[in-house]
C-alpha cells in the first residue's frame, strides 16, 4: 500500500544528502540494545516497524505494509516468538481514514492484539506524562542511563554538522502479553542491557558457525 507518508519516505531515502532534522521516524535500534531486549523478552521474530535495510527480526512490516492494518497475533502464531517495535513518534496521520502513524494508535493496537494472543515488546521513550503512555501494559522495564539510536543506513550527511550529538533520552521496554506472570515494573542499567546483548550476539555467532540447526 502506498500513501503520502510512504512517498515522502521514498523521496527522502533517495535524496543526495540529508539533515538530522529530516530523520524523523527512521532512527534505528542499536544492535546491543536490540539483542539485550531479545535476551530478556524474546525470541523476537517479527519487527513491526522496519524496512528492508534496518529490520532486526527475520520477518518485518515496512511502512508500505502499515503494521496498523496487519494481524500481528496471527503472524506470531505462525512464527513463534514475540514481536518487536521501535515505533515511529510522528504525529497521527491517516490515509483513507486508516491510521498510518501516531503513538496512541500504535499502543492501542498493541493492546488489542494482546487480547488475541502473543507478546509485543516495544523500546520507547520513558515518557510517562505523554497521552500515549501505555498504562495498561503488562510489564514496563525502565532503563537506567540514557539511550541513543543509530542513523539509518541511507543517511548521507549534508555537511559535518549532521552528526548526532544529543539523541539520547530516558528509555523503557514495554511489554504487552496477557500471559505475563511477573512483576509489573522492573529496572535495568543500560550497561547491563548492553552486556546481555553482547553475550547474546556472541552466542548467535557461535551457533551460526556450527551450521544448520536440526
What are these regions (language model features)?
Residues 1-214:
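Class I S-adenosyl-L-methionine-dependent methyltransferase catalytic core
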Amino acid at each position: 500500500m502506498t500513501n503520502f507518508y510512504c512517498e515522502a519516505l521514498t523521496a527522502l531515502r533517495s535524496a543526495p544528502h540529508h539533515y538530522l532534522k529530516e530523520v524523523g521516524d527512521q532512527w534505528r535500534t542499536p544492535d546491543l540494545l536490540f539483542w539485550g531486549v531479545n535476551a530478556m523478552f524474546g525470541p523476537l521474530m517479527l519487527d513491526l516497524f522496519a524496512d528492508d535495510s534496518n529490520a532486526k527480526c527475520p520477518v518485518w512490516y515496512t511502512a508500505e505494509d502499515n503494521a496498523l492494518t496487519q494481524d500481528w497475533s496471527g503472524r506470531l502464531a505462525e512464527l513463534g516468538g514475540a514481536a518487536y517495535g521501535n515505533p515511529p513518534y510522528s504525529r497521527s496521520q491517516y490515509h483513507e481514514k486508516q491510521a498510518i502513524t501516531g503513538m496512541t494508535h500504535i499502543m492501542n493496537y498493541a493492546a488489542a492484539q494482546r487480547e488475541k494472543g502473543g507478546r509485543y515488546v516495544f523500546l520507547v521513550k520513558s515518557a510517562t506524562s505523554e497521552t500515549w503512555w501505555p498504562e495498561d501494559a503488562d510489564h514496563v522495564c525502565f532503563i537506567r542511563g540514557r539511550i541513543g539510536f543509530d542513523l539509518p543506513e541511507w543517511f548521507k550527511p549534508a555537511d559535518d554538522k549532521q552528526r548526532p550529538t544529543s539523541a539520547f533520552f530516558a528509555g523503557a521496554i514495554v511489554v504487552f502479553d496477557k500471559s505475563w506472570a511477573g512483576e509489573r515494573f522492573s529496572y535495568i542499567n543500560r550497561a547491563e542491557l548492553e552486556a546481555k546483548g553482547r553475550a547474546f550476539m556472541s552466542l548467535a555467532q557461535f551457533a551460526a558457525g556450527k551450521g544448520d540447526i536440526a
